[in-house]
Amino acid sequence: MAEPLLVVGLGNPGENYARTRHNLGFMVADLLAARLGAKFKVHKRSGAEVVTGRLAQRSVVLAKPRCYMNESGRQVAPLAKFYSVPPADLIVIHDELDLDFGRIRLKFGGGEGGHNGLRSVAAALGTKNFQRVRIGIGRPPGRKDPATFVLENFSSPERPEVPTICEQAADATELLVEVGLEPAQNRVHAW
C-alpha cells in the first residue's frame, strides 16, 4: 500500500486571522476536511491539527499548522517524518501574491516568492521540491506593504467570490491527488 500524501493548508491561527488573505490555505483545508466528513484533531508529536482519510481513493493526511505562518515548517517537517511522507509527496496549499485574485495554479518546487510560510517549510524539509496549490490574491494596490495586505480581510468586492475560489482550490487539490501534477496542471490551468 502506498504511503499517504501530506496535504497542508497554510495560515495563521486565531479568530483575528480567520478571514484574511493569508488564511486561504486554512480555508481550503477546512473545506477538504468537511468533504471527508472529519474534524481536525491535534497531532501530539507535531502540534498541528490533522485529519486522516481518503481523497480520490488515495490515503491522505490533511494538516493545518497551529503555529504562525512564518514558523509552519516546524510543524510540517515532524508530520512528514511521522507519516513517512517524502517532500515530493507533500502538497502545500497557500495564498499567492504573484497570481491575480482567484487564479489557481499548481507547481512543483521553485522559489517561495517572498512567502514566509513556504520559506519555513522549505527550510525545515531541507528542500523546495514539494507540490503547491497556489491561490491568487493579487498584488496590493498602490504602495501598500504586501505584509500588511496579506493580513487584511478580503475587500467587499472580493468577499463574495472567496467561497467559490476555495471550492475550486479544493477541487484542484483533489485532482492533483487523483491524477498527479502534470495531468492536473493541464486541466486546472485551463480553468
Curated annotation (Swiss-Prot):
Q: Which GO terms describe its cellular component?
A: cytoplasm
| Enzyme Commission number(s) from the entry | 3.1.1.29
- Annotated site (Stabilizes the basic form of H active site to accept a proton), which positions? 95
Name where it's found.
Cytoplasm
Q: Which Gene3D superfamilies match?
A: Peptidyl-tRNA hydrolase (3.40.50.1470)
User: Catalytic positions?
Assistant: 22
Single GO biological process annotation from the record: protein quality control for misfolded or incompletely synthesized proteins
Q: Does the keyword Thylakoid apply?
A: no
> Per UniProt, which keywords does this protein have?
Cytoplasm, Hydrolase, RNA-binding, tRNA-binding
Q: Which SUPFAM superfamilies match?
A: Peptidyl-tRNA hydrolase-like
Supply the Pfam families for this chain. Answer: Pept_tRNA_hydro (PF01195)
- Name the principal localization, coarsely classed: cytoplasm
Named from the GO MF annotations, one term is: peptidyl-tRNA hydrolase activity
Question: At what residues does the UniProt record annotate the site feature described as Discriminates between blocked and unblocked aminoacyl-tRNA?
Answer: 12
Give the binding site residues for tRNA: 17, 68, 70, 116
Q: Which reaction does it catalyse?
A: an N-acyl-L-alpha-aminoacyl-tRNA + H2O = an N-acyl-L-amino acid + a tRNA + H(+)
Instruction: Outline the subunit composition.
Output: Monomer.
Assigned protein family: Belongs to the PTH family.
What is the annotated role of this protein in its UniProt record? Answer: Hydrolyzes ribosome-free peptidyl-tRNAs (with 1 or more amino acids incorporated), which drop off the ribosome during protein synthesis, or as a result of ribosome stalling. Catalyzes the release of premature peptidyl moieties from peptidyl-tRNA molecules trapped in stalled 50S ribosomal subunits, and thus maintains levels of free tRNAs and 50S ribosomes.
- UniProt name for this protein: Peptidyl-tRNA hydrolase
